[in-house]
UniProtKB/Swiss-Prot annotation:
Protein name per the record: Bifunctional protein GlmU
A GO-annotated cellular component: membrane
Gene: glmU
Known cofactor(s): Mg(2+)
Pathway: Nucleotide-sugar biosynthesis; UDP-N-acetyl-alpha-D-glucosamine biosynthesis; N-acetyl-alpha-D-glucosamine 1-phosphate from alpha-D-glucosamine 6-phosphate (route II): step 2/2; Nucleotide-sugar biosynthesis; UDP-N-acetyl-alpha-D-glucosamine biosynthesis; UDP-N-acetyl-alpha-D-glucosamine from N-acetyl-alpha-D-glucosamine 1-phosphate: step 1/1; Bacterial outer membrane biogenesis; LPS lipid A biosynthesis
Length: 460
């Protein structure tokens, strides 16, 4: 087990978000900002992680339940005060402790590991994670001496003209010698404009004691982004989306327009897949090799196998096997299974149903709570009537059956293998194997009756 520890600051309300949801629970690329930070922290293999909770603590704890210890900051009295809340869990332990805000979703595990290596190799008591900003306005500046040693952190409002020209900024992430951190926290106070305990004050305490403080500069400024409002949230989303899409492209996926493609962080895509513009892939979706998703397709928590073609359709919580074609304008709802080489065409809705291998439903159909066998033809306009206002009922269709167009199947009904359901029928009873089911009125022609209606030329 390592002697690395982590404190994630997640107690704040995030007033500028203008939301009832705690700030760290807003999502970027499908998971909360807090989860992004926790994943980065996990890369350093901490022996303990303590998450500081406060505003709506129960919601925050639910996200990391079983993954972190928690400490409650009942009053938000500053970053230093927040870290103090972790003392019962961490005080006295040998090693180094990361302190990181839960609203920094772009930080990477690689950067945190580099921070630890830098800290240990330089034998620092504290190391600040910094970044070079083209426009440092609003950030605390890192002030170094002529030898490049960190002297202090100066906030924007306190900086003189020279200090304001410094482009190295404090990201708000730190690595400390664990014992010295909690010793120094006992010496900070609220003698400042905000009346709060500032974590940055421990840096001054270390310097005054002649202890070594360093700074590790991030390679990518984007990683330093702290999200305080919806504008920054959108910025984080855009940066993360670019990272995700580029990762898939490097792995052999073709994107027609990556700037207009939205893929959550946990989505998996096989090589040689083609993703057209305005495709949205969410949750735990898996896309197989060589599968094509055309413009406008949306998939959530579904598994789509290799060599499928999904055209401008919605698929949710379902499984699509190899060689299936769906759409355009189809809706595959939760709990559905489309087996190998199934075809589901335009304006077809499938809900909690299984379609067997080679089955085709080409147009204007609703199949709900149905099990359809192999090589079945489902004609245009077929409707399974599966709901009586309270209960759902099942339709079963055997292999090689033929369901004629404009058929209504009032469940529960079983249609046998090789059966034929006559077009235009309303089916209320089972149809045996090899039988024809007909449920419609017999046609009757009345000669000359059309002349009585206003449309007829004789009436004009």
């Amino acid at each position: 087990m390592s002697n690395n520890y982590a404190i994630i600051l997640a107690a704040g309300k995030g007033t500028r978000m203008k939301s009832d949801l705690p700030k760290v629970l807003h999502k970027v690329a499908g998971i909360t900002m807090l989860e992004h930070v926790k994943r980065a922290v996990d890369a350093m293999e901490p022996a303990k992680t303590v998450t500081i909770v406060g505003h709506k603590a129960e919601l925050v704890q639910a996200v990391l339940e079983g993954q972190s210890e928690f400490a409650l900051q009942s009053e938000q009295l500053g970053t230093g005060h927040a870290v103090m809340m972790a003392e019962p869990a961490l005080a006295g332990l040998e090693g180094q402790t990361l302190v990181i805000a839960g609203d920094t979703p772009l930080i990477t595990g690689e950067s945190l590991k580099n921070l630890i290596n830098f800290h240990v190799s330089h034998k620092n008591v504290a190391t600040i994670l910094t970044a070079q900003a083209d426009n440092p306005f609003g950030y605390g500046r890192i002030i170094r001496n002529a030898d490049g040693e960190v002297q202090k952190i100066v906030e924007q409002k306190d900086a003189n003209d020279f200090e304001k020209q410094v482009k190295e900024i404090n990201t708000g992430t730190y690595l400390f010698d664990n014992k010295r951190l909690f010793e120094a926290l006992k010496d900070i106070n609220t003698d400042n404009a905000q009346g709060e305990y500032y974590l940055t004050d421990v840096i001054s305490i270390f310097r005054q004691a002649g202890e070594k403080v360093g700074a590790y500069v991030l390679r990518d400024f984007d990683e330093s982004l702290g999200v305080n409002d919806r504008v920054a949230l959108a910025t984080a989303e855009a940066v993360m989306r670019k990272r995700i899409n580029e990762k898939h492209m490097v792995n052999g996926v073709t994107f027609i327009n990556p700037d207009a493609t939205y893929i959550d962080i946990d989505v998996e895509i096989g090589a040689e897949a083609v993703i057209e513009a305005n495709v949205v892939l969410k949750g735990q979706t898996v896309i197989g090799e060589r599968t094509v998703l055309t413009n406008g397709t949306r998939v959530r928590d579904a598994k789509i196998a290799a060599d499928a073609v999904i055209s401008n359709s919605d698929i949710e919580e379902s499984v699509i096997e190899e060689g299936v074609t769906v759409g355009p304008y189809a809706h595959i709802r939760p709990g559905s299974l489309l087996k190998k080489d199934v075809h589901v065409g335009n304006f077809v809705e499938i809900k909690a149903s299984t379609l067997g291998q080679g089955t085709k439903s080409g147009h204007l159909t609703y199949l709900g709570n149905a099990t359809i066998g192999n090589n079945v033809n489902v004609g245009a306009g077929t409707i399974t009537v599966n709901y009586d206002g309270k209960n759902k009922f099942k339709t079963t269709v055997g292999d090689n059956a033929f369901v004629g167009s404009n058929s209504t199947i009032i469940a529960p009904v079983t249609i046998g293998d090789n059966a034929l359901l006559a077009a235009g029928s309303v089916i209320t009873k089972d149809i045996p194997e090899d039988a024809i089911g007909i449920g419609r009125g017999r046609q009757e022609n009345k000669e000359g009756y059309a002349t009585r209606f206003p449309f007829h030329p004789s009436q004009k």
